[in-house]
């Protein structure tokens, strides 16, 4: 509990906004369930949880004294963060589920999925900001920029693996062999590389826009 409160107060204003927006998103789903008598789209709650994981990790990492913590711990946190950060941006692809909606429900679902995608994307950008702050204490600004673009492209690849290949972060534990084989195939595919780079550019420019707005 103390750990959660510490992270909450670390950036209280932002976390308050995230909390209120999360309540709004959950309320939207409950309203939809009441209207349609269906729990369809409730998978968005799980996707949102996965989007929060890298944000929590990067917030915790930012609170650490990197000079006085074991490198193994720091590298482990960074590895877990890299595995989960694509989940933050992945929710935007859930717009594909609008194909199953029509009439009034289509517009309601558009608002719901867009709301979850917005908070997920925002969490991803905030997490990238945390990473950039830490990164610039280790390497030059030039190399930090290159690294962030590479991570954005890796996020694009992660989205490809999740949306097209239909794997998720937990398959690393539950289905590692098939995952590794399909990752190797995808890594040598022009289609997946194009997909990854395009999503990477999209994420990176969104990050730059957010960065330039908040720096004013």
Show the residue positions of the predicted features:
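Juxtamembrane non-transmembrane "cap" segments at the membrane-aqueous interface
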Residues: 156-177
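Hydrophobic alpha-helical membrane-insertion segments
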Residues: 78-86, 147-162
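Membrane-interface transmembrane-helix boundary segments in multi-pass integral membrane proteins
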Residues: 42, 168, 178-203
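Transmembrane alpha-helical segments in integral membrane proteins
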Residues: 122-135, 197-216
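Short, hydrophobic transmembrane alpha-helix segments
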Residues: 30-42, 61-66
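Membrane-interface helix-boundary motifs at transmembrane edges
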Residues: 7-11, 62-73, 133-143, 216
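N-terminal membrane topogenic signal
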Residues: 3-20
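Central hydrophobic cores of alpha-helical transmembrane segments in multi-pass inner-membrane proteins
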Residues: 47-63
């Amino acid at each position: 509990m103390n750990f959660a409160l510490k992270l909450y107060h670390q950036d209280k204003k932002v976390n308050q906004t995230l909390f209120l927006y999360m309540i709004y998103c959950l309320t939207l789903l409950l309203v939809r369930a009441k209207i349609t008598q269906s729990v369809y789209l409730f998978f968005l709650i799980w996707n949102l949880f996965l989007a929060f994981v890298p944000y929590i990790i990067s917030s915790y990492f930012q609170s650490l004294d990197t000079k006085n913590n074991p490198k193994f711990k720091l590298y482990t946190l960074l590895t877990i963060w890299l595995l989960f950060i694509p989940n933050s941006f992945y929710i935007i692809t859930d717009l594909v589920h609008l194909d199953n909606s029509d009439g009034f429900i289509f517009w309601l679902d558009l608002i719901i999925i867009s709301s979850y995608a917005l908070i997920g994307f925002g969490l991803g950008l905030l997490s990238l900001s945390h990473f950039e702050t830490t990164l610039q204490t280790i390497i030059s600004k030039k190399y930090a920029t290159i690294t962030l673009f590479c991570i954005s492209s890796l996020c694009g690849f992660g989205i490809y693996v999740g949306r097209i290949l239909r794997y998720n972060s937990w398959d690393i534990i539950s289905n590692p062999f098939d995952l590794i084989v399909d990752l190797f195939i995808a890594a040598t595919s022009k289609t997946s590389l194009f997909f990854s780079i395009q999503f990477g550019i999209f994420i990176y420019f969104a990050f730059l826009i957010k960065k330039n707005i908040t720096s004013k």
